[in-house]
Amino acid sequence: MVEVYRSADAQAVERSVEAADSLPPLRLCADVEALTLGVRPPETEALRVRVDELRGRVDVARTLGLSGRIVEAHAQLSALMPEVDATDYRPLVAEAELARAGASELPEERIAALERAVWMAEVSHHDRVAAEAWVQLVEARGTGANEFVRALDAVARADAAIERIAGDPELRIRLDVA
């Protein structure tokens, strides 16, 4: 986030509070159980280095989107996806698809990215990303695509995903108002 805001334009500054609000809560840093469960690290040192590098690039692109530079964020994330997919590290694919969904202006594209993010997150036990993706899927189907029945079907899955991460109150509120 620092990298994007180092050269921020007026639009980015206006959206900086929203971008800061999108960061995971600080209390998660103290939750030892949450930090040690779930996602397995990459199997080799070389893969870990590659995943860290790509994760950094995904985070920069995601921050661009949060700062209002959606077109640039979408272009960067679309260009990154083949490299992310090539790692075959599903937690990273889930994170990248979630970021790509956030930078997608077309409802169908956003939903497709969220569905893939959910699948990759669930299969790799990346519960926080799965919960976030499920909540966004409810929002995207209910408001963006007018798929109300499918949105209602996704509510139960989103609720279960939130429970797996100890009932995150912020996600719970977003689900309740979706």
Each predicted region: which residue ranges?
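Solenoid-repeat scaffolds in large eukaryotic assemblies
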Residues: 73, 80, 93, 110, ...
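Alpha-helical junction/boundary sensor with strong preference for TPR arrays
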Residues: 5-8, 12, 84, 121-124, ...
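Amphipathic alpha-helical segments of tetratricopeptide repeats
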Residues: 78-86, 115-123, 156-164
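N-terminal alpha-helical interaction modules that lie
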Residues: 2-71, 142, 159
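Acidic, Ser/Thr-rich low-complexity linear motifs
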Residues: 7-15, 43-46, 89-92, 164-173
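Structural signature of alpha-solenoid helical repeat junctions
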Residues: 52, 85, 89-92, 99, ...
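Tandem amphipathic alpha-helical repeat scaffolds
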Residues: 22-24, 54-68, 95-107, 132-147, ...
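Hydrophobic or amphipathic alpha-helical targeting/insertion segments
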Residues: 3, 119, 126-139, 147-153
